[in-house]
């Protein structure tokens, strides 16, 4: 049974330590949610077939509970819980006894049955300010000073205006001054918890995407889609939230003006990889973190989703931090060490962190920026443009990864540019 190794990708480090080490992998039997599963249905089923299937599941589950006293084990078996529909992908979560799981695995309408898993966020600590990441975005990959506050960040003044960045994370402090009223609360999947950010990570990520000081796309809107609370979640909540995002983008006619950022990475989990692929086919771009294990990202979710934009971390002098995952599945490298952004604890709070969690929103911000300046028509056009702008062969120790660093293309534009810092 495959277990999930999720850690929120902002790695802890002590003051003065410029080479953070990765958190231990969070794998073990406790990662599986006892008695809870994600069921993926085969494609091509009609609404009537899906409805009949659910009735069959309820009947079989009820009969098995009565016949085998499954509840005596202490495992919660409540039947079907939530249904997820992303493009033409249909899945549902549920609490089932072992006999029902066996019956489900043999059902002709069922593609797969996966145990639900806990998803964990790693610990974070505070570090002195560093502002090199934005300057790097417009430097064509030239090394920039780590601690300088005089680095220029040049950008088109459309700066993501009219674009929506959905942050699937721990929530966002939408009242933070960095967002200037451009952040809104979207969906909260966590039962009996307020739609706030008690952990800090979602606010941090959103600040890199669209903060007025720390953001790549300084005029973009950000939407809080909360699937984590104070350190952990399950795919039951993550899939619910991703499903809501895709529906909201579609219903709001924002497909060409929206990007999803998911700055979390863990062991391979096919149901979520499938969801990312279906969102892409529906016309929605997703940017994800490569992961912080210092290993090949091909075994990570959602980094291994073929049509996600997978982002590794690079340092200010163009070296790969030892924590950053790598490999052929990594599409692009972006600033990911000692990056300052918004934080929890107040409407002016900031923190400096490291990890591919910081790298991913730099690229999500670039996607929002390019959507506003170039009117890119599809996620495939978005990916092609982002990769076309990259600067090649700069990352030291990129392993067998495509060696491409992020660039916003501003030096090729023919007009007076605003400068930042």
UniProtKB/Swiss-Prot annotation:
Ranges where the Inhibitor I9 domain occurs: 36-122
Full protein name: Subtilisin-like protease 2
Q: What is its EC number?
A: 3.4.21.-
Query: Which family does the record claim for this protein?
Result: Belongs to the peptidase S8 family.
| Source organism superkingdom | Eukaryota
| Family annotation (InterPro entries) | PCSK9_ProteinaseK-like, Peptidase_S8/S53_dom, Peptidase_S8/S53_dom_sf, Peptidase_S8_Asp-AS, Peptidase_S8_His-AS, Peptidase_S8_Ser-AS, Peptidase_S8_subtilisin-like, Peptidase_S8_subtilisin-rel
Write out the propeptide range(s). 17-122
Q: Does the record bear Protease in its keywords?
A: yes
This protein's species is Trichophyton tonsurans
Disulfide-linked positions: none
